[in-house]
Amino acid sequence: MSGNTYGKLFTVTTAGESHGPALVAIVDGCPPGLELSLEDMQRDLDRRKPGTSRHTTQRQEDDVVEILSGVFEGKTTGCAIGLLIRNTDQKSKDYSAIKDLFRPAHADYTYHHKYGIRDYRGGGRSSARETAMRVAAGAIAKKYLATQGIQVRGYMSQLGPIEIPFKTWDSVEQNAFFSPDPDKVPALETYMDQLRRDQDSVGAKITVVAEGVMPGLGEPIFDRLDAELAHALMSINAVKGVEIGAGFASVSQRGTEHRDELTPEGFLSNNAGGILGGISSGQPIVAHLALKPTSSITTPGRSIDIDGNPVEVITKGRHDPCVGIRATPIAEAMMAIVLMDHLLRHRAQNAEVRVATPVLPQL
């Protein structure tokens, strides 16, 4: 069965290709009465859209979202919310020379073997263009979560060899890299300019944080909250790794260092990333995701054609030298969608659960 839908109670279904006429989404399960405007979604879409700096693809898409259903007089009705974003700046001729070739490290080869047919224009369905609808749907989830005191934010924590320490949220929206350290921005710009001259690409690491999440979200065993987050974040194009909390650094930690001790004043650390036993602990939920270097580069690479003959491939078109630069709002959206779904699932089963133990304050 095709995997175009995510969620159990809050579901998001997307459709559309990179060079098709439009992208569409159906968002179902949103409670009625939520105040929702185009601006609520457009704000995040503008953070993701291409062509916003010299360091991203120069494809010019306005990414203007249209609401087709599910909203009346500025409020959600409880019915399915239909969304549409029209593609306006396709240049399909850029891909005519490679329609019978497989671009290295792309989905061309695997889509061909799975379906026997593929839209070669910009990668078709496998293109990161699809994530625009995730961001629109995620904005709805973020709007509802905010009414519950939950905030989801992200930032770039590494670009290539440059590690970016967290300094302030105020810096994140003030530069094209979503860098939380303004002092790192000049180095990032210099690195990206050199990368473009080298006709190469690079990967990145994104950190996304949810604050205000109450204890109890997550459905053991198979739908543990961390498992669901890993699933959702790994579904983003180019993501090759996900960590929750300390992640792989846990390997070198001792138990006395890793365990998050509890006191009446709160947890003493957050190596678990806000999730214990697959259930939210009330601490900030922290996830990191690694994105591979962009596969579309102008440096020639070896491959084969559809008949199995060796060829040399030079990818033309307009591409991001680092897909991670625009990935922060996408990661935020997917975390918000997961939390929204699990909030509704928890409420459906455990709305009457009450315990005397106080909820510990967040760090």
Curated annotation (Swiss-Prot):
One MF annotation (Gene Ontology) recorded for this entry: FMN binding
Catalytic activity, reaction form: 5-O-(1-carboxyvinyl)-3-phosphoshikimate = chorismate + phosphate
GO biological process: amino acid biosynthetic process; aromatic amino acid family biosynthetic process; chorismate biosynthetic process
Metabolic or biological pathway, per its Swiss-Prot or TrEMBL entry: Metabolic intermediate biosynthesis; chorismate biosynthesis; chorismate from D-erythrose 4-phosphate and phosphoenolpyruvate: step 7/7
UniProt keyword annotations, A-Z: Amino-acid biosynthesis, Aromatic amino acid biosynthesis, FAD, Flavoprotein, FMN, Lyase, NADP
Family stated for the protein in its record: Belongs to the chorismate synthase family.
HAMAP family: Chorismate_synth
Protein name: Chorismate synthase
